[in-house]
Amino acid sequence: MFLLYEYDIFWAFLIISSLIPILAFFISGILAPIRKGPEKLSSYESGIEPMGDAWFQFRIRYYMFALVFVVFDVETVFLYPWAMSFDVLGLSVFLEAFVFVLILIVGLVYAWRKGALEWS
């Protein structure tokens, strides 16, 4: 029971930092005007009247390419601390990292065969 006294500041900070955004959204919802005129519903293109339809579809290839990039970018974030402390951690952590990289290589080969890396 006495060990919980060390976390009083943490809990107070957590409660206050949770209440501030909730109160901000609540107060802005009360004070904000709710009129939706034609200007509010029109598309905005850098201060110029929109020409044509403002909504158009992107090709799924862009999303797939970005998704593969994010996966391998996160992989580097996970592998960097491991590489910096490789000499301290030992063989078991090396094997775990090897399995991690192997799974990612299998994913890369799968994405390659499905054509997710083809740009044309």
Curated annotation (Swiss-Prot):
Its main location: plastid. Its EC number is 7.1.1.-. The chain crosses the membrane at residues 9-29, 64-84, 88-108. One of its GO terms (cellular component) is NADH dehydrogenase complex. GO terms for molecular function: NADH dehydrogenase (ubiquinone) activity; quinone binding. InterPro entries: NAD(P)H_OxRDtase_bac/plastid, NADH_UbQ/plastoQ_OxRdtase_su3, NDAH_ubi_oxred_su3_sf. One of its GO terms (biological process) is photosynthesis, light reaction. It is found in: Plastid, Chloroplast thylakoid membrane. It is a multi-pass membrane protein. Keywords: Chloroplast, Membrane, NAD, NADP, Plastid, Plastoquinone, Quinone, Thylakoid, Translocase, Transmembrane, Transmembrane helix, Transport. It catalyses: a plastoquinone + NADH + (n+1) H(+)(in) = a plastoquinol + NAD(+) + n H(+)(out); a plastoquinone + NADPH + (n+1) H(+)(in) = a plastoquinol + NADP(+) + n H(+)(out). It is an enzyme of class 7 (translocase). Belongs to the complex I subunit 3 family. NDH is composed of at least 16 different subunits, 5 of which are encoded in the nucleus. HAMAP family: NDH1_NuoA. PANTHER family: NADH-UBIQUINONE OXIDOREDUCTASE CHAIN 3. NDH shuttles electrons from NAD(P)H:plastoquinone, via FMN and iron-sulfur (Fe-S) centers, to quinones in the photosynthetic chain and possibly in a chloroplast respiratory chain. The immediate electron acceptor for the enzyme in this species is believed to be plastoquinone. Couples the redox reaction to proton translocation, and thus conserves the redox energy in a proton gradient. This is NAD(P)H-quinone oxidoreductase subunit 3, chloroplastic. It comes from Jasminum nudiflorum. The gene is ndhC.
